[in-house]
Amino acid sequence: MKQNKKLLVMAGGTGGHVFPGLAVAKKLQQQGWEIRWLGTADRMEADLVPKHGIEIDFIKVKGLRGQGVSKLIKAPFQIINAILQARRHIKAWQPDVVLGMGGYVSGPGGIAAWLSGIPVVLHEQNAVAGLTNQWLSKIAKKVFQAFPGAFPTAEVVGNPVREDVVALADPEQRMAERDGDIRILVMGGSQGAKILNDTLPVTMAQLGEGFTVVHQAGKNNQQQVIEQYKSHSVDNVQVTEFIDDVAQAYEWADLLVCRSGALTVSEVSAAGVGSIFVPFMHKDRQQALNADHLVECGAALMIEQPQLTADKLANTIAQLDRNELKMMATKARQAAKLDADVTVAEAIKALAK
């Protein structure tokens, strides 16, 4: 009896690492592969991955950035211990290939796989490579990048995006008969973005009628943001902590105001929605670089955080009529790379032969 091939996915910490890993995992599951996950017990993958029917093993590992001297001295021992933990899981399950999607867990897991003679495939979601993937790229059999620039020679494939987002109708079809209020979707990620939560109520008060807003405020921010909109007499708004059906939200929206994390940029492009990006201020400008290609092709606008004011945002939105928004949405969809999950899955299959 032929035994199914096995993939171990290493990804954790944030949705930007976990969701693309799930997209590749689902693609291979549909082809009969067995999937297992390596993560950490105190991050989002611990809850999210089992909900998708995938078993998960845990190792203890933390990031090194921002640690005090005493913790840095202990770091080599903690890393070695994490590698040994990962190697025990790998030895017990015997995967054919290991896929690293980033996050702290990928480092020890990737080294353990390499020491075990198991091929490692990497995917970097951001325009600036994370420290873990920089290290692992030297031992990986195949390296992919979502945006140009993370690695000098890696294949650019985009980010694996959820199937329900990819399946949305083209923006020309979706937006053809729309009239009435311009629909604005505000997203700051699962934790929200304070600057968006503070700025949008003032912006919408300045813009007045003609707009409807759905605002994802993030965990524990909902009531405060509702009060801010009320204090500025803005009624045509729905504020929520989370958006469960992101694809439906993209389908509804005419314009997105959001951060430019790697997964958000890829999803916005795949969905075909015009955007105003307000990048988080990383030292390496990671989020700004993620969004550059959509800005350059006319699919999005960018306001860097130091320049963001309610006045500037209101003036920017006021200049976008329905025709302009449709054009931006179409350009976003044209720029999308919709088969990243297939490309990564095929590379994994080739290495397992």
UniProtKB/Swiss-Prot annotation:
Q: From the Swiss-Prot or TrEMBL record, what is one GO molecular function term?
A: UDP-N-acetyl-D-glucosamine:N-acetylmuramoyl-L-alanyl-D-glutamyl-meso-2,6-diaminopimelyl-D-alanyl-D-alanine-diphosphoundecaprenol 4-beta-N-acetylglucosaminlytransferase activity
The principal localisation class reads membrane
Q: How does it sit in the membrane?
A: Peripheral membrane protein
**Which SUPFAM superfamilies is this protein grouped with?**
UDP-Glycosyltransferase/glycogen phosphorylase
Q: Which reaction does it catalyse?
A: di-trans,octa-cis-undecaprenyl diphospho-N-acetyl-alpha-D-muramoyl-L-alanyl-D-glutamyl-meso-2,6-diaminopimeloyl-D-alanyl-D-alanine + UDP-N-acetyl-alpha-D-glucosamine = di-trans,octa-cis-undecaprenyl diphospho-[N-acetyl-alpha-D-glucosaminyl-(1->4)]-N-acetyl-alpha-D-muramoyl-L-alanyl-D-glutamyl-meso-2,6-diaminopimeloyl-D-alanyl-D-alanine + UDP + H(+)
Q: What Pfam families does UniProt report for this protein, alphabetically? A: Glyco_tran_28_C, Glyco_transf_28
User: Can you tell me which family this protein belongs to?
Assistant: Belongs to the glycosyltransferase 28 family. MurG subfamily.
**By what name is this protein known?**
UDP-N-acetylglucosamine--N-acetylmuramyl-(pentapeptide) pyrophosphoryl-undecaprenol N-acetylglucosamine transferase
Q: Which organism is it from?
A: Vibrio atlanticus (strain LGP32)
Q: Could you tell me the gene encoding this protein?
A: murG
